[in-house]
């Protein structure tokens, strides 16, 4: 920041030099004007002297006129160029006023449209915060300086959540959702903030946000976790188990949250047993003949238009059945080519499993924004029997286009 102001000061000095040099030169013109005034006085004195001599009879009228002409020529010679010097006098105030206004106007314009606040923020974020409150204050200043930054609003919302400021977090996530095109991850965080700030009550708005998030990304982890919590709080333990088992199936094995979620599943089973209900059977790999093996790849043409960390969803959906995927696996472009297995263990809903439908369609979709909505790169397979045992090749080779309604 010091370097910036030093450079700005040097530039200002250069600008003032251009303005003040003419003003300093004007001082020399003052001496010239004084000399001109003296010459005029001498001229007038000479004319008066000639007139006196003519009145005394020592000069003729012709000699008087010759004397006046000679005095006028001398005055003209002495005052040559004085007109230009006098014009410089008139302009002397202009550079002086400009010299004062230029830095003031420049400073005002810079403070209004400049990026001094962003430079200061960048300097702040280069240093580790001393507390969570300091980090929050920095993020608040950041979104004020860049109100159209979806990432800034998202991280501010996450920070508010760590401070149990759910209402503030909900407003931040709402703004992030508007700026990000309503990405599923942001919608899930927004729904979660509304849920916890509203006394853990499921509302129509929260349900709509959760549905929208899962429609875009069936494996959106925040939404699955939230729906499991809401179901548990409402003593819908079977639903809670279903949501949490779906969540566990998409989390990496090394994710520390897995053990906590599995603990929640176990508590839900115990509550069902205490209430005299039969818990659902633990999720297990599907029996032989219901597992579909898919070899997923991406064409060179599409590979050049996506990023290595873009999400890839591989899923199966029923032919002539509901549009909800029956089983889904999540990869990244960097994982391709890859071989995955889809089975009842990957079911999105307990009542919708591969084994419940005779034919399915395999789909692999690239999601730049981490969701599975239309408009992404896609590869589709032909309808096949769920009893198919051979590996199926699936290549992502073109943009997603709306399909005609399936029979």
UniProtKB/Swiss-Prot annotation:
Chain positions of TPR repeats: 150-183, 221-254
Keywords per UniProt: Cell inner membrane, Cell membrane, Cytochrome c-type biogenesis, Membrane, Repeat, TPR repeat, Transmembrane, Transmembrane helix
Xref: InterPro entries: C-type_cytochrome_biogenesis, Cyt_c_biogenesis_CcmI, Ig_CycH, TPR-like_helical_dom_sf, TPR_CcmH_CycH, TPR_rpt
A Pfam entry, by short name: TPR_CcmH_CycH
Biological processes per GO annotation: cytochrome complex assembly
Domain of life: Bacteria
Compartment(s): Cell inner membrane
Region of interest (Disordered), residue spans: 388-407
Coiled coil: none
SUPFAM superfamilies: TPR-like
Bilayer topology annotation: Multi-pass membrane protein
Transmembrane segments: 4-24, 93-113
GO annotations of cellular component type: plasma membrane
Primary localization class, coarse: membrane
Protein role: Required for the biogenesis of c-type cytochromes. Possible subunit of a heme lyase.
Family: Belongs to the CycH family.
The name this protein goes by in its record: Cytochrome c-type biogenesis protein CycH
Organism: Pseudomonas aeruginosa (strain ATCC 15692 / DSM 22644 / CIP 104116 / JCM 14847 / LMG 12228 / 1C / PRS 101 / PAO1)
